Amino acid sequence: MANLKEIRDRIVSVKNTRKITEAMRLVAAAKVRRAQDQVLKSRPFADKLARVLENIQSRVQFEAVDSPLLSKRDVKTISLVCITADRGLCGGYNTNIIKKVEIRYAELIKQGYEPNLILVGKKAIGYFQNRKDRYIIKTTFKELEQVPTAKDSEGITSEVLAEFLSENADRVEIIYTKFITLVSCAPVVQTLLPLDPQGIADENDEIFRLTTKDSKLLVEKSNIEKSDSEKLPSDIVFEQSPDQLLDSLLPLYLQNQVLRALQESAASELACRMTAMNNASDNAKELASTLNLTYNKARQAAITQEILEVVGGSAV
C-alpha cells in the first residue's frame, strides 16, 4: 500500500483536476448558449431565402433553367468536405466524424468513384495528412471562429464552387455532426452540389436551451416555429431572366447550407465537450472519495501499528 504522503498528494492532484474539468464544463455550457443564439439569429435569413427559392421554383421549372449549380452530370470525382474541431477534450466527437469520413471514402472507391477531401479543423487535417498515401487532400481550413459566422463559410463555399464549376468535382458532399440534443449528436452526409433547393430548416429541428435550477444545468426543448410562406404575386414580372436570378440566389443558398453545417458542428463539439468534462468531474469526485477511504484505512493501520509497538515495548 502506498504511504500516507503519496495518497495525500494524489488526493490533492485529483481535486485540482476536478476544479479544471468543472471550469471547462461551465465554459463549454456558456459557449453552447452562444452557438444556439447564433443559429437562431441566422435562421430568419436562411428561412426567407428558402421561401424565395420555393416561390421562384413554383413559377419557373428548375429543370428548364441552364444553371451550372443545378446541372447533374455523369459522376466520376466526388469531393468530401469534412468538418472537425481544432481542439480535443470533447469525447468521441472528432473520432466519430473521422470514422464516418473513412467509411464514406472507402464506399466511394468501392463504387468506382474518385473521392478527395476538403478538410475543416486541425483534428481532421492532422489525421489525414499522416495518411496521405491513402487519401487525396485538396484543401484545408483551420482556426475558424468558435461560433461560426458567414465569413467562415465564405471561404469553404468559394472552394467548393471552384471545384464544382471547374469540373474537378462532379459532386460535393459535406460530412458534419448534426446537433440532436446536448447529450446526443450524429455524423451525417449531405449532398451540397449539384443543388436541389427544398428549404433550409428541417421540420423536425428543435431548439435546446440551457437553464439552471438549484445550481444544476437543465435543458429546455422546443420545436422551431416555421414561418408562413409568402407567395409571390401571380402577376409579378421578373426584370432578370431565371438564369440570372438563380445565379445570384443559389450561391447564397449554398453558403447558408455550409454555414448551417458549421454551426451545428460547433454546437455538437461544445455539447460533447460539456458532457466529457461533466463525466471527468464525476469520475474525479468518485476517485477522490476512494482515495480518501484508502488514506483513512492506511492512517488507521499506521496508528494501530504504533499502538501495538508501544504496548509491546511496555510489556518487555
UniProtKB/Swiss-Prot annotation:
Record Pfam families: ATP-synt (PF00231)
UniProt entry keywords in alphabetical sequence: ATP synthesis, CF(1), Hydrogen ion transport, Ion transport, Membrane, Thylakoid, Transport
One GO molecular-function entry: proton-transporting ATP synthase activity, rotational mechanism
Compartmental location: Cellular thylakoid membrane
Disulfide bond entries: none
Origin superkingdom: Bacteria
Record keyword Membrane present: yes
GO CC annotation: plasma membrane-derived thylakoid membrane; proton-transporting ATP synthase complex
Membrane topology: Peripheral membrane protein
Oligomer status and interactors: F-type ATPases have 2 components, CF(1) - the catalytic core - and CF(0) - the membrane proton channel. CF(1) has five subunits: alpha(3), beta(3), gamma(1), delta(1), epsilon(1). CF(0) has three main subunits: a, b and c.
Family under the similarity heading: Belongs to the ATPase gamma chain family.
Stored HAMAP family: ATP_synth_gamma_bact
Function as written in the Swiss-Prot or TrEMBL entry: Produces ATP from ADP in the presence of a proton gradient across the membrane. The gamma chain is believed to be important in regulating ATPase activity and the flow of protons through the CF(0) complex.
Name of this chain's protein: ATP synthase gamma chain
Provenance organism: Prochlorococcus marinus (strain MIT 9312)
